[in-house]
């Protein structure tokens, strides 16, 4: 009887200590998440991702906080992809105009038999740059679509 009472008291004490440390860990994880959100709102996406990564490594048991951190990570990735898409789009428009201008000039020079190797090389390089930008644009669109799909799950 005495042993079972001592055992019960020890278990209750251990359970209480675990609950307290769990609450402290949960609070610390929440603080880390708030810090990551602050970085995100300031536009420091890399710092926000690092904070989220640290949260996941240091507090693996803070499941609810980690779920919130995952949503924040998705928002960060989405924002980065949208900004990169906007930049890629503006560069793509400029390079498209450059390519059309160079192509028209080279075609006129070819017709007049005045096309130089430098002009032809410039046309080829501009076309390669244009194709590369189109691929990048398509990849960013696909990434944004994928992130939206994951956010709905």
Feature-to-residue mapping (PLM):
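C-terminal motif of bacterial Sec signal peptides marking the signal peptidase cleavage site
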Residues: 16-19
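Boundary/linker segments of alpha-helical solenoid repeat arrays
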Residues: 60-68, 84, 97-104
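A conserved position within tetratricopeptide repeats
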Residues: 56, 96-103, 110-113, 117
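Alpha-helical linker/edge segments of TPR/alpha-solenoid repeat scaffolds
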Residues: 74-98
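Start-of-domain marker
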Residues: 21-68, 80
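TPR/TPR-like alpha-solenoid helical repeat scaffolds
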Residues: 62-82, 111, 119-129
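Bacterial N-terminal signal peptides that target proteins for export
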Residues: 1-7
């Amino acid at each position: 009887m005495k042993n079972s009472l001592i055992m019960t008291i020890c278990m209750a004490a251990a359970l209480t200590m675990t609950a307290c440390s769990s609450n402290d860990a949960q609070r610390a994880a929440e603080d880390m998440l708030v810090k990551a959100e602050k970085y995100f709102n300031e536009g420091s996406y890399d710092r926000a991702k690092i904070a989220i990564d640290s949260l996941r490594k240091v507090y693996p048991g803070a499941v609810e906080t980690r779920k919130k951190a995952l949503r924040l990570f998705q928002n960060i990735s989405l924002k980065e992809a949208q900004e990169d898409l906007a930049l890629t789009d503006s560069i793509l428009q400029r390079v498209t105009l450059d390519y059309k201008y160079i192509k028209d000039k080279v075609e006129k020079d070819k017709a007049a038999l005045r096309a130089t190797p430098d002009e032809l090389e410039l046309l080829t390089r501009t076309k390669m740059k244009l194709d590369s930008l189109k691929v990048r644009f398509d990849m960013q669109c696909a990434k944004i679509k994928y992130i939206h799909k994951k956010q709905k799950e």
